[in-house]
Curated annotation (Swiss-Prot):
Domain of life: Viruses
Protein name: Nucleoprotein
Motif (Unconventional nuclear localization signal): 1-18
Cell compartments where the protein resides: Virion; Host nucleus
Annotated family: Belongs to the influenza viruses nucleoprotein family.
Modifications after synthesis and translation: Late in virus-infected cells, may be cleaved from a 56-kDa protein to a 53-kDa protein by a cellular caspase. This cleavage might be a marker for the onset of apoptosis in infected cells or have a specific function in virus host interaction.
Record organism: Influenza A virus (strain A/Duck/Czechoslovakia/1956 H4N6)
Motif (Bipartite nuclear localization signal): 198-216
InterPro entries referenced in this protein's UniProt entry, alphabetically: Flu_NP
């Protein structure tokens, strides 16, 4: 847990390491992505994929999902104990797309999980390499964040659909460890906690007995993770109240929803990492790049540089716009689903448009979609500049809250103001300031009211030329201060359904 004891960088969380110096971190992250690359190459050989087919992002996703499923111990155990019709608990598979006679055809493959685990371990020097698995989970999570909206999930837990910018990592599996916890947004943590409290309200044995003790420990741990994301004393104090509650119920749910709303202006610290599809690492390893020797970082220039020299393809449905498909994947690669569009556009060097204006559906193709009309095109994943990823949330100085906009959780450490509609946010805070958290609530509301939309965050931070790998010459962009930059405005995307 980042909030207690030693502070570890999120690369250390990613690689399960204890405190390491920068060189060791770069080497162990390099070892991790190199292992993913080696695994991918081996899988392409097993499946006899051509070079072109191996660069197809849909094939990459199928292969990633197979290895994640092969190592999902909980689910494997569950499947063995509850055999369902037509599902072999020992096998995993998915659609692989091949080019035949100028057409794309779908082939469903099935593999022994044991065999997949063997190939994965072999690619990772015989180890389980959990860090690499988590890395793939975060890439899938970032792709979901860019592709789907979670309105329904928000409404179900009693939250406001406009809080979508707090929902980073909402589709991450529970087994994603410390690295997964670091990238979860405030809203995601709140939602997990509310679900837990609701179960406790409906099932009186939830907190009781041996199981209940474990549940309680999990509850307190999640509270601590969320507390660690808040940056003001009052928000943290409220989290202590929620955590210490004898019998969590509706009062705690109220407090959590209040805290989630407050995070729209007093933003939490949420980590951002550029996690790329397995095929990208595979391409680099195949071309002879030694990740472990060169070192790698998820938050610096490395992912940008990797994407500059990688050609990845995607299947395109008949009425989809390939440029829009590219934008979706670019945002996923850089974990920029909740970033200000002005900043993303500047870094990418082409205009990044809000999702309501994208003519593209998700990257994955459903099994009932017609392959006859499928085409493929190159994804344009290159960028004009690079910038350092942030985990601070961009509050101007730790104690005093800065401005935030409904729907921005900054990804890049780049100077800008964070415009927001104060009236909209503050309207949600009428009424309830009594009860045991009243002084904290009052304090939080006071801080929110003093926040100014024109305050500049990330003072002096800029983007860098791709030739400037040591980040010596920051280029500080100037943005139109009034312009809103939310990706989710006027949204018509599909809901995320498991």
């Amino acid at each position: 847990m980042a909030s207690q004891g030693t502070k570890r960088s999120y690369e250390q969380m990613e690689t399960g390491g204890e405190r390491q110096n920068a060189t060791e971190i770069r080497a162990s992250v390099g070892r991790m992505v190199g292992g993913i690359g080696r695994f991918y190459i081996q899988m392409c050989t097993e499946l006899k994929l051509s070079d072109y087919e191996g660069r197809l992002i849909q094939n990459s996703i199928t292969i990633e999902r197979m290895v994640l499923s092969a190592f999902d111990e909980r689910r494997n155990k569950y499947l063995e104990e509850h055999p369902s019709a037509g599902k072999d608990p020992k096998k995993t598979g998915g659609p692989i797309y091949r080019r035949r006679d100028g057409k794309w055809v779908r082939e469903l493959i099935l593999y022994d999980k044991e065999e997949i685990r063997r190939i994965w371990r072999q690619a990772n020097n015989g180890e389980d390499a959990t860090a690499g698995l988590t890395h793939l989970m975060i890439w899938h999570s970032n792709l979901n964040d860019a592709t789907y909206q979670r309105t329904r999930a928000l409404v179900r837990t009693g939250m406001d659909p406009r809080m979508c910018s707090l929902m980073q990592g909402s589709t991450l599996p529970r087994r994603s460890g410390a690295a997964g916890a670091a990238v979860k947004g405030v809203g995601t943590m709140v939602m997990e906690l509310i679900r837990m409290i609701k179960r406790g309200i409906n099932d009186r044995n939830f907190w009781r007995g041996e199981n209940g003790r474990r549940t309680r420990i999990a509850y307190e741990r999640m509270c601590n993770i969320l507390k660690g994301k808040f940056q003001t004393a009052a928000q943290r104090a409220m989290m202590d109240q929620v955590r210490e509650s004898r019998n969590p119920g509706n009062a705690e749910i109220e407090d959590l929803i209040f805290l989630a709303r407050s995070a729209l202006i007093l933003r939490g610290s949420v980590a951002h990492k550029s996690c790329l599809p397995a095929c990208v690492y595979g391409l680099a390893v195949a071309s002879g790049y030694d990740f472990e020797r060169e070192g790698y970082s998820l938050v610096g220039i490395d992912p940008f540089r990797l994407l500059q020299n990688s050609q990845v393809f995607s299947l395109i449905r008949p009425n989809e716009n390939p440029a829009h498909k590219s934008q979706l994947v670019w945002m996923a690669c850089h974990s920029a689903a909740f970033e200000d569009l002005r900043v993303s556009s500047f870094i990418r060097g082409t205009r990044v448009v809000p999702r309501g204006q994208l003519s593209t559906r998700g990257v994955q193709i459903a099994s009932n979609e017609n392959m006859e009309t499928m085409d493929s095109s190159t994804l344009e994943l290159r960028s004009r500049y690079w910038a350092i990823r942030t985990k601070s949330g961009g509050n101007t100085n730790q104690q005093r809250a800065s401005a935030g906009q409904i729907s921005v959780q900054p990804t890049f450490s780049v100077q800008r103001n964070l415009p927001f509609e104060r009236a909209t946010i503050m309207a949600a805070f009428t009424g309830n300031t009594e009860g045991r958290t009243s002084d904290m609530r009052t304090e939080i509301i006071r801080m929110m009211e003093s926040a100014r939309p024109e305050d500049v965050s990330f003072q002096g931070r800029g983007v860098f030329e791709l030739s400037d790998e040591k980040a010596t010459n920051p280029i500080v962009p100037s943005f139109d201060m009034s312009n809103e930059g939310s990706y989710f405005f006027g949204d018509n995307a599909e809901e995320y359904d498991n």
